Amino acid sequence: MQNPTQTMHIYDMPLRVIAGLSTLAKTTEEDDNTSTGIVVSEVGEPQVVNHPAWIDPFVAYQLRAPRKNITPDFIFGRADIGNAFSAFLPRRFSAPAVGTRLVVDPVFTYQQRTVLGLYNYFHADFYYIVHVPAPLGTGIYLKIYAPEFDTTTVTRGIRFKPSASPTIALSVPWSNDLSTVETSVGRVGQSGGSIVIETIEDNSNETVNTPLSITVWCCMANIKATGYRHADTSAYNEKGMNFISVPVPKPPVPPTKPITGEEQADNEVTAEGGKLVQELVYDHSAIPVAPVVETQAEQPEVPVSLVATRKNDTGHLATKWYDFAKISLSNPANMNWTTLTIDPYNNVTLSRDGESMVLPWRRNVWTTGSKSIGYIRTMVAQINIPRPPQISGVLEVKDSINNSSISLVEFGGKVEIPIIPKVMNGLATTASLPRHRLNPWMRTAESKVELQYRIIAFNRTSDIADLNVSVLLRPGDSQFQLPMKPDNNVDTRHFELVEALMYHYDSLRIRGEEQSLPENAPNAVSNPQQFITPATALSAEEYNVHEALGETEELELDEFPVLVFKGNVPVDSVTSIPLDLATIYDFAWDGEQNAISQKFQRFAHLIPKSAGGFGPVIGNYTITANLPTGVAGRILHNCLPGDCVDLAVSRIFGLKSLLGVAGTAVSAIGGPLLNGLVNTAAPILSGAAHAIGGNVVGGLADAVIDIGSNLLTPKEKEQPSANSSAISGDIPISRFVEMLKYVKENYQDNPVFPTLLVEPQNFISNAMTALKTIPIEVFANMRNVKVERNLFDRTVVPTVKEATLADIVIPNHMYGYILRDFLQNKRAFQSGTKQNVYFQQFLTVLSQRNIRTHITLNDITSCSIDSESIANKIERVKHYLSTNSSGETTEEFSRTDTGLLPTTTRKIVLGESKRRTERYVAETVFPSVRQ
């Protein structure tokens, strides 16, 4: 019985050229070079070649007759590598002097070299594209052929005039007296895949800079190998494959009495089936070439039906090209790449008043793009190169800094290039958080894109030295989710500090495999007219909901509500209730053991059944407030998942309004139960509503009956006490996880559990007296999960602290977002305000911290502060960030001087009062503070 043959699929074709050369004919009908004498062929008419590494078919002259090669099938180990990892790689050569020859040897990619290194023998075919930029006055005449035996032997080939047709393609099939040769040795006298370029005549004008530059692309294709090379039977291991145990706490051992135990039998656990990998289908959105005047552009298609949908946020932006940068193109000294970074959130050039490019990024939390080419791309850059006839060349542009797709822009040509977000370019150095590789959404503030360019062909006359080219931008396929109220601008002098906090502390490196999901029909669409704030999305964010995993456990125990909070909360202030469900305490009883915590102890995996606008949903919360009849007011509430913890912290610190984030509900209580149509529930898209103590308003049923257009008259309305409505909403978790697998360290580095924010407002009594606090209770259930992998004989279990709420964990990659919110708030610079106190505490904690992956809310609020001004604290943190990598210690950082020279852009007078210094800083950031 023959050993089985295995198949490997290589997706996304690295280094594929997606915009080719206009001077390279695509069909034989287009090519009339032989009939007009531009090309003199000794090898017949050109043939059409299709290769996956080049977007279009092209015609190529066959320098050798193709043959059917034999691959010996009796030697152990064979591989049909084919065109996997093939790419057209450019090189530049100087044209040889008249009567001399240039031998161009073939090259192949690093990936091909790695795969071919597994075998001893191979054969392959080669393709060449030769391009000679021909500025005005070029008169060179070239001959190209495939060599034989030695450098003086000439074979049949082609002659062509670059001034009339600067680009020509060649096919060099395998030719050898042996069907395969040794990969690293070869055979004396073999032809190989090389070509020879000879200059026959050069009648170029004296103004043309010589020697002329010739660009040659080479592609090795149709590779077959035999003779497995490595007889290595060693076993290798990488950390990402292993079971990594949670550290087990060691109990103290009494010195006199050793602990003895009994032998226990091992119980084998049957592993559940893994997740199926299926190709996702992404639709390409229409980006108008010539948009209709005074008309919005069409909305881009979502990358996959499982992600949340929203209204068109870029309809007007997509009709205009925005100037971004000017680049200069001149004769390059080498083939190095130049990187152009575009930050659509912070860039000053894109932040002009009016219909600014940055606006959609600044008024939303999440953004994604289109997967029409196989991977996510967002913004579109246009490179349009005007040129005079005295200069000629080709610009090579990549849509990321990785080996992704390539566009070739001829001088005088134009190309539009969608660009890959930096955090999704596939490099381990850029995707630092799990959500960057597990979910297609990224935060708008981290949506930088990068493109790289280099000149691969360049010839000119002495009349001109370089070209200036404008890079234009459009939002392209960018789309957004989770709208917020607009933010204030941050002083540009603080950009580098915010950037450093976002990227300096972001040092996590987590490996894993991103898997795709089958497309499922989305849940019912919500009715946004019901809600006082925008809905988080018009449909559920289901990308990481895996319906095939787990089983539903029907226990009456799950129907018991868990009282997760009980107490007085201040009016007109945001109260945070962390819903760390794995360690939740039931305040209704001595609740270390409760329906929720017990589920985490019994199972390793808790899998959400459905999703809402924020992402996967595991249950619901319900808020109750038992107030006397003479008291009335309203309650704002929203539950923000762990990947939005910075949004929660900013509202706790009073930097942003709770009404400024989508999904916040306003519930009127006391007096008339419903004042007009104020919704009493957060937008519930998950279909998982299990309200406690009343009927949920704002769920899917309401979306169907459309309560917004079917209001009852006052006489028809029920009395408030007859059928009370529950103040309820979803409990979402971070969108990048498929299941809850609680490991405390992981959930501190990348929070998953949500924070419930509650803000009572305008509570007054019959005597029109304002209340300072009101008593509330918050119940929660976790009835929207399936279970998987039972656990027995556990040693490490989630710790539930008696009558204690969990602390809010702020991971290091969120520091920059919170700092930005402080810098946008003018009260943070006004002495005596709570925002100013929190700002000082936050900066102090940053300056005192050791190497940690997170801080907690309590670390900030319990931090003592001194009389040092905000301005000095900011400069101190800047100094710390700029010198920490060189080995500065915490003791060094506690110095009173910052080690910085005074700057002219910001006057910091240490001898003046703290109040005057901070007022100056506030006025420089917020001119409206001046009075």
From Swiss-Prot:
The keyword Transcription regulation does not apply. It is found in: Virion. It comes from the Viruses. Keywords: Capsid protein, Virion. Proteolytic processing of ORF4 polyprotein yields the VP4a, VP4b and VP4c capsid proteins. One of its GO terms (cellular component) is viral capsid. ORF4 polyprotein codes for VP4a, VP4b, and VP4c, three of the four proteins that self-assemble to form the icosahedral capsid. The capsid is made of VP3 (coded by ORF3), VP4a, VP4b and VP4c. This is ORF4 polyprotein. It comes from Nora virus.
